[in-house]
Amino acid sequence: MGTHRIILGLAALCCFCLPHLIEAKPFEVIVDQSGHGNFTTIQKAIDSVPINNTHWFFINVKAGLYREKITIPQKKPFIVIVGAGKRSTRVEWDDHASLAQSPTFATLADNTVVKKITFANSYNFPSNGKINKNPRVPAVAAFIGGDKSAFYSVGFAGIQDTLWDSDGRHYFHRCTIQGAVDFILGSGQSIYQSCVIQVLGGQLGPGVTGYITAQGRTNANDANGFVFINCLVHGFGKAYLGRAWRPYSRVIFYNSNLTDVVDPLGWWEWNYQGYEKQLTYAEHGCFGSGSNTSRRAKWVKKLSASAVQHLADLSFINRGGWVEDLPIRV
């Protein structure tokens, strides 16, 4: 009887500690290029999801390089795509020039969740360590346009406009984002937590400075902005933390490791010279060889501790508690 109670107790403890291992998956299909799944392409699996879907629909993608473009339409919410790992499952395409038409992966739907997969736009991306000689143009790896969407251990690989964080509330956790120019852009209301931001400045040539973010907040009442919490910024060459794509651009780096890849000036007003007071760019509690702010642009705001805490908190994106309702846990 004593042994029986101990076993039951351990089972209960495991269930409490590891909720992510016992997620309910009411609808599930497998994508496998070898033909041993339900589909051989991710897009065909997405196509199988009913219009106006109301239940979490899991698409498990086996390891491999998938040469395809993927779109989740607006009327197909509640899709979960799970790969075998950022380095094992990779989706790659090479459209370019048109920002709107180039994304390798695009979701227009609310409640999109992705885990353990990499989306790459290969048009300008270096191959086997060699500089890519294609003319540099916008070439998007991923477009995120729906609300209440989350990305766990996802890779985004490109050079210019890699991750188009367009609109809606988004949560990125332990993701890797690679690029050189405006490679995290858009008007999303997003938290990037424990992510790796890798600057690939070698693609720009000697002495050319890149830009990590190009945030597009258009007026003072907009709730959107990019918040980076406990992130690592590293790589090669030099890059500004951000430049203003729109007149009320807002980006915060909080408790993050900024290496010397960060240009000492830090931020650029771009087309909004004379309107710098409208921009909200801040660094709080950051460390590392590129975190010294003594040479930052003089117009950069000094936010109060309470203002920083408001932005650098999950509540910034989590109205309604949608993050806790996701079928995948951190």
UniProtKB/Swiss-Prot annotation:
Annotated GO biological process: cell wall modification; pectin catabolic process
Catalytic residue positions: 161 (proton donor), 182 (nucleophile)
Catalytic activity, EC: 3.1.1.11
Gene3D superfamilies assigned: Single-stranded right-handed beta-helix, Pectin lyase-like (2.160.20.10)
Pathways per UniProt: Glycan metabolism; pectin degradation; 2-dehydro-3-deoxy-D-gluconate from pectin: step 1/5
Keywords recorded for this protein, A-Z: Aspartyl esterase, Cell wall, Cell wall biogenesis/degradation, Glycoprotein, Hydrolase, Secreted, Signal
Residue positions the entry lists as glycosylated: 38, 52, 257, 292
Molecular function terms from GO: pectinesterase activity
Keyword Cell wall biogenesis/degradation: yes
Entry keyword annotation includes Glycoprotein: yes
Signal peptide feature range: 1-24
Reactions it catalyzes: [(1->4)-alpha-D-galacturonosyl methyl ester](n) + n H2O = [(1->4)-alpha-D-galacturonosyl](n) + n methanol + n H(+)
InterPro entries documented for this protein: Pectin_lyas_fold, Pectin_lyase_fold/virulence, Pectinesterase_cat
Top-rank lineage group of the source organism: Eukaryota
GO cellular component, one term: extracellular region
Residues annotated as binding substrate: 243, 245
Cell compartments where the protein resides: Secreted, Cell wall
Assigned protein family: Belongs to the pectinesterase family.
General function of this protein: Acts in the modification of cell walls via demethylesterification of cell wall pectin.
Name of protein: Probable pectinesterase 55
Organism: Arabidopsis thaliana
Gene that encodes the chain: PME55
